[in-house]
A protein has these predicted regions:
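A subset of solvent-exposed loop/turn segments in beta-rich extracellular surface proteins, enriched
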Residues: 1-101, 134-143, 228-235, 239-243, ...
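Outer membrane beta-barrel transmembrane domains
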Residues: 15-23, 27-29, 191-305
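Transmembrane beta-barrel strands of outer-membrane/channel proteins
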Residues: 1-4, 63-67, 118-126, 181-185, ...
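Glycine- and aromatic-enriched membrane insertion/assembly motifs of diderm outer-membrane
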Residues: 34, 38-70, 174-203, 211-218, ...
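Short loop/turn motifs that connect adjacent beta-strands in outer-membrane beta-barrel proteins
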Residues: 7-9, 58, 107-118, 131-133, ...
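Outer-membrane pore/translocation modules
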Residues: 62, 66-193, 197, 243, ...
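Transmembrane beta-barrel architecture of outer-membrane proteins
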Residues: 32, 43-48, 95-101, 117, ...
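Residues on the lipid-exposed face of transmembrane beta-strands in outer-membrane beta-barrel proteins
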Residues: 49-53, 63, 100-106, 122, ...
């Protein structure tokens, strides 16, 4: 599965703000006293390779590895003024965190208006992604510096072991229609080696799909999530930019997605599945100032034996 996510501009709470408003905000690192670097755009590409194995109908084991590629474009302003000194791009790339877990059958539901099956998931995220990514930055003193520790969103992993439980319901077919829902979470089990932990996360989502043909279906999905603020701090992340402020982390996010799913039926195509989904943010309430989510495009391929 491959995902391409874009962000553009900045929000304070629910409202868009410009560079001039960001420059009025205090810098928790002290020098300079106010923020002087403002993110403009961010593009994150994630490629996930997963495998699942079901020895019986009651349990399915899963494993997933992830490759990250992130780039962020930023403007730098003078330390003693609001003069625009220039722009620069930060990049990070490498292996993300690895997930191992299992899906366990929970049984059937046969109510009048709720007919289907549910299962629960238990997974552990292993901190294989780097949290010490560095890059070249333009400082408010108008200096190009290499080897500077990049802010939290540019790191490749959480640095912690994370517990990832989930509960999922999938309906039986109602004519051409199906529906489902899921509640899931991420619980950080400890602080990482750099002295912080990302916020715990809760997600709720629901979907409806309709069969278009024997091999194709379309779906609409709505998801909402809440993430706590980051706790602790990495003493090496000190750039006067919103993404380096620990109070400016976490918040609310809701997305609306439209997708198409194609499943091979016969011959060499049997067992092959191709999925395409476009996601757009419809609500975001950031803690402090954060970048504004835009769109995500996901392309997935699956082969079943």
């Amino acid at each position: 599965r491959h995902m391409d996510m874009s962000m553009k501009g900045n929000l304070k709470g629910r409202h868009s703000i410009d560079d001039a408003q960001v420059l009025n905000l205090p810098n928790q690192h002290g020098s300079p006293a106010q923020l002087r670097v403002v993110p403009e755009t961010m593009d994150m590409k994630m490629t996930m390779l997963g495998a699942m194995y079901a020895p019986n109908d009651e349990i399915t084991f899963l494993a997933m590895a992830m490759q990250h590629e992130t780039s962020m474009r930023l403007n730098t302003y003078g330390a003693m003024s609001r003069t625009l000194l220039g722009s620069f791009t930060s990049r990070s790339e490498g292996l993300g965190d690895t997930t191992l877990g299992a899906l366990l059958a929970g049984g059937d539901v046969t109510q009048k208006y709720l007919n289907g099956t549910w299962h629960y998931g238990l997974a552990l995220s292993i901190p294989t992604g780097s949290i010490q990514q560095t890059g070249r930055v333009l400082t408010p003193m108008n200096q190009q510096i290499s080897g500077k520790r990049l802010p939290y969103p540019m790191q490749l992993g959480s640095g912690t072991y994370d517990f990832k439980p989930s509960l999922t319901f999938n309906s039986a077919a109602h004519g051409e229609w199906r529906y489902g829902g899921q509640v899931s979470g991420v619980v950080r089990l400890d602080d990482n080696s750099q002295g912080y932990r990302l916020g715990d996360k809760t997600n709720v989502q629901g979907w409806v799909s309709r069969r278009l043909a024997a091999f194709a279906s379309a779906s609409i999905r709505l998801d909402a999530s809440y993430q706590d603020q980051l706790r602790g701090a990495d003493s090496a992340i000190t750039l006067p930019v919103p993404t380096a402020q620990t109070d400016f982390t976490g918040g609310e996010l809701a997305n609306l997605s439209v997708g198409f799913n194609f499943v091979g039926q016969h011959g060499i195509w049997a067992g092959h599945r191709l999925a395409l989904e476009w996601t757009s943010a419809i609500h975001q309430k950031a803690n402090g100032v954060q970048m504004e989510f835009q769109d995500t495009l996901t392309l997935g391929y699956q082969k079943a034996w």
